[in-house]
Amino acid sequence: MKNIVDNVYIVKPYDPNVPGCCVYMVDTRSDDGLVMIDAGLDIEPIRAIAKEGYDLKDIKHCLITHGHIDHYGVCSKLKELNKDIKFYAHKLDAIDNVLKIRDPNIAQMYADYKYEPVKINRIIKDDNEILKFGTYEFKCIHIPGHTPGSVAYLLETESKRILFGGDLPGVVINKQGGNLEAYVKSIQKLLNLNIDIMCEGHENIIEPAKKASKFLRAYIQFNEQLNKLIEYPSDTKVLLNLALISYDLEFYENVLDFCTYLLEIEPNSIDAQQLIDKIKEFNPSKIDWIKNIIQQNN
């Protein structure tokens, strides 16, 4: 567990070898106890807060950024720790006040994972709705695109504007239920917030403000290019653009994915080979990732 600012923590950092999302926590220092932002898939990282002197029964609220199981799968275990815990999610993801797997692709990915659907106690209906816990106020910002009911939670402390954004760099594919047009509008909305610290679902903490802004702008470009690639799977220019954007974002595994795939199509691509040479000390490529996305959508 790592302190971000006073009373705000990252409980489970991103680890590419461990499934689930990043988990964040705010100690309200009030009768509202501890507020978790997303819960992940595994209870053990959350249990670790006990080592820092926290009682797990004091987790009284869990704000869920969107309806993908890697962000809420362990919620039933949180309920076992505190039967009075309240869960929060947007109405467009929590259909009939319940979060459960509805996407067949995600169901296949988590076929071996046992979970219980999550009953949502407080449905977020309106953009900019305020949730107040002790002296802490979370503004609920509806950011559809990755899912229809994606929500970012903005927390303003005395010194920083902190955004808990869920899967802001998530893959947004129109043919898989994403909405690229909505996603672009959502990111543009967030760019106007002057965020100091962005607490992301799969990339940890991004700061300062200039870096957070660069990250958001780059991911608009990434998803625009990714959707183009699905339409034109052999377009080497688009593949190279995706590799270059990934390089700027320091997503080196993605660089290898796109360059390796590009070299299958155009074996003599000097640009692709040069990028691979730049990052050859990083993990080997996983070309199946991009191949699978294209196959699923064609």
Features from the language model and the residues they span:
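Conserved beta-strand hairpin/beta-sheet module of binuclear metal-dependent hydrolase folds
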Residues: 1-52, 152-168
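Active-site HxH/HxHxD metal-binding segment of metal-dependent hydrolases
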Residues: 41-130
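Short Gly/Pro-enriched turn/cap motifs at secondary-structure boundaries
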Residues: 13-15, 119-122, 142-144
